[in-house]
Amino acid sequence: RRQRQMCIRDRLECNVDDMTAEELGFAMETILEAGALEVYTVAAGMKKSRPGTILCVLCHEDAKETLVRVIFRNTTTIGVREHRCSRYTLKRSFETVQTPYGDVQKKLSSGYGVAREKYEYEDLARIAREQGMSLAEVRKSI
């Protein structure tokens, strides 16, 4: 049985060296809300020896034009590069686990000879705040 989950996606990239961390974070949130599959940054050396950031956006082809507009509107870049890339993913599913603190979602990921389980951060953070515990204490107690 084949476990391969690979698809071709578009990757949009741009360089920025004159945005604050807050501005870049806001841009990333806005890009995700506009339909990006993934948004991440890579630290890079820019021209004139400036530290900068490469903003990377993975998307479906039909979202590309919209996302380019969102990138230009929310960053200081003057150019966006486009690449085709292969994206390999594990199969994902969720299950609800009953705990002494209420229901918690658990993400199950598998494929390529790997199986993983991970509790959802938002649920753990909620319990930690409600119970006055650290995230590590919550993980250990459930």
Regions found by a protein language model. Give the residues of each.
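Short, small-residue-biased leader/transition segments that mark boundaries at the very start
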Residues: 3-8
